[in-house]
């Protein structure tokens, strides 16, 4: 989860988020090199007194500044497209969870189980227990098994919402009348926090998401107790 004054991304907990973090670093390094080159050229222009007023064209330079940007864009586009396809792939999910956005709470349905569904509301500040996070804690957490591919089906009952958990690299729009899907795979157990990431009304900031990733044995015990 995020912490105060954090400048970087949250710690990656899923393979997709690891890829996104690497892509972010890769792109940032390219931007840094280009910015350094531009600043260096500007500093030369401001400090040198040498000019070439008689130069009418320079085909070699024009060729370089046409080809080089194209190569840079390809170096950015290829890993980006690869990650986009990875995010769309869902290979043999062991579990499917249907997520519905409402004003202003989430409802979850485990479609592989009969009558395993619940609503998830934010816990008011006055009801928080010691150690719980303000505006991020919910009354019913989404419990899922770790290290297994899980399919999330996401939609909305009223207006546009967005189901997002940054540490897992997830952000999927919840659109009325449309069913979007995403893959959840966690590399380790723990609590992972998110929020609605699409402005949906006056209580938009009071729609937290809490995923509790646990070993498969604990998930089976939890699901049996909920049915």
From Swiss-Prot:
EC number(s) stated in the UniProt entry for this protein:
7.1.1.9
Q: Which CDD domains match?
A: CcO_II_C
Positions contributing to Cu cation A2 binding: 196, 198, 200, 204
Cofactor(s) annotated in UniProt: Cu cation
Q: Which PANTHER family does this UniProt record tie to the protein?
A: CYTOCHROME C OXIDASE SUBUNIT 2, CYTOCHROME C OXIDASE, SUBUNIT II
- Does the keyword Transmembrane helix belong to this entry? yes
User: Which ranges sit in the Mitochondrial intermembrane compartment?
Assistant: 1-14, 88-227
In the record, biological process GO terms are: ATP synthesis coupled electron transport
UniProt key word Protein biosynthesis: no
Residues engaged in binding Mg(2+): 198
Annotated localization: Mitochondrion inner membrane
Cofactor details (free text): Binds a dinuclear copper A center per subunit.
Give the Mitochondrial matrix membrane side ranges: 46-59
Task: Please list every transmembrane segment annotated in the UniProt record, as residue ranges.
Answer: 15-45, 60-87
- InterPro entries per record: CcO_II, CcO_II-like_C, CcO_II_C, Copper_CuA, Cupredoxin, Cyt_c_oxidase_su2, Cyt_c_oxidase_su2_TM_dom, Cyt_c_oxidase_su2_TM_sf
Q: Which residues carry this modification: Phosphotyrosine?
A: 218
Spell out the reaction equation it catalyses: 4 Fe(II)-[cytochrome c] + O2 + 8 H(+)(in) = 4 Fe(III)-[cytochrome c] + 2 H2O + 4 H(+)(out)
Question: Which organism encodes this protein?
Answer: Dacnomys millardi
Purpose? Component of the cytochrome c oxidase, the last enzyme in the mitochondrial electron transport chain which drives oxidative phosphorylation. The respiratory chain contains 3 multisubunit complexes succinate dehydrogenase (complex II, CII), ubiquinol-cytochrome c oxidoreductase (cytochrome b-c1 complex, complex III, CIII) and cytochrome c oxidase (complex IV, CIV), that cooperate to transfer electrons derived from NADH and succinate to molecular oxygen, creating an electrochemical gradient over the inner membrane that drives transmembrane transport and the ATP synthase.
- Put simply, this protein is called Cytochrome c oxidase subunit 2
One CC-aspect GO term: mitochondrial inner membrane
């Amino acid at each position: 989860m995020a912490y105060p004054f954090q400048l970087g991304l949250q710690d990656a907990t899923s393979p997709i988020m690891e890829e996104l973090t690497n892509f972010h670093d890769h792109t940032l390094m390219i931007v840094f090199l280009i910015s350094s080159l531009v600043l260096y050229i500007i500093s030369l222009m401001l400090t040198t007194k040498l000019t070439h007023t008689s130069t009418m064209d320079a085909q070699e330079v024009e060729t370089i500044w046409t080809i080089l940007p194209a190569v840079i864009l390809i170096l950015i586009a290829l890993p980006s497209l690869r990650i986009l396809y990875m995010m769309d792939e869902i290979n043999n999910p062991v579990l499917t969870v249907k997520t519905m956005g409402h004003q202003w709470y989430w409802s979850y349905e485990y479609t592989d189980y009969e009558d395993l569904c619940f609503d998830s509301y934010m816990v008011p500040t006055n009801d928080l227990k010691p150690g719980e996070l303000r505006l991020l804690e919910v009354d019913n957490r989404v419990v899922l098994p770790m290290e297994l591919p899980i399919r999330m089906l996401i939609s909305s009952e009223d207006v546009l919402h967005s189901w997002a958990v940054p540490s897992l690299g997830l952000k999927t729009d919840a659109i009325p009348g449309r069913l979007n899907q995403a893959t959840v795979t966690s590399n380790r157990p723990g609590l992972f926090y998110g929020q609605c990431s699409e402005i949906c009304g006056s209580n938009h900031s009071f729609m937290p998401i809490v995923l509790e990733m646990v070993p498969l044995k604990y998930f089976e015990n939890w699901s049996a107790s909920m049915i």
